[in-house]
Amino acid sequence: MRVWIDADACPKMAKELVVKFALKRRFEVVLVAGQPQSKPALALVKLIVVPSGPDAADDYLVEHAVPGELVICSDIPLADRLVKKGVAALDPRGKEFDAQNMGERLATRNLFTDLREQGQVSGGPAPFGDREKQAFANALDRILTRLARQS
């Protein structure tokens, strides 16, 4: 099994949790980034730095992740592409992307993008705290268990 991480936008705490799970469950973690990042000095963790450019990391993830694997990402259009390919996708706050919720997630994203462009909404998501960490850990455990059963 392999877990991919869209590393540029993923909170450090979420990356660390994935590595802890990988050590216990023995799976590979692949960090994909548009810029160099630090990574744990563990054989089961790899870092792939893609050439800079719009959506380069996203395109790499869509091209290389396969059904039966999991991608951690907060990018909703990326998650949509992955779900359509049959790849499991989870955001760092513990919300799984799936075929049933993608339409709503995309519509909400597009609405907030429009509101931000009009100056009606500012800021981003709340800081990543203990509640988000616990929700992510629970969802990660649930999805990894499901994927292990399917393989």
Swiss-Prot record:
InterPro entries: UPF0178
Coiled coil: none
Pfam families xrefs: DUF188 (PF02639)
Domain of life: Bacteria
Family: Belongs to the UPF0178 family.
NCBIfam families reported in the protein's UniProt record: PRK00124.1
Protein name: UPF0178 protein Pfl01_5469
Organism: Pseudomonas fluorescens (strain Pf0-1)
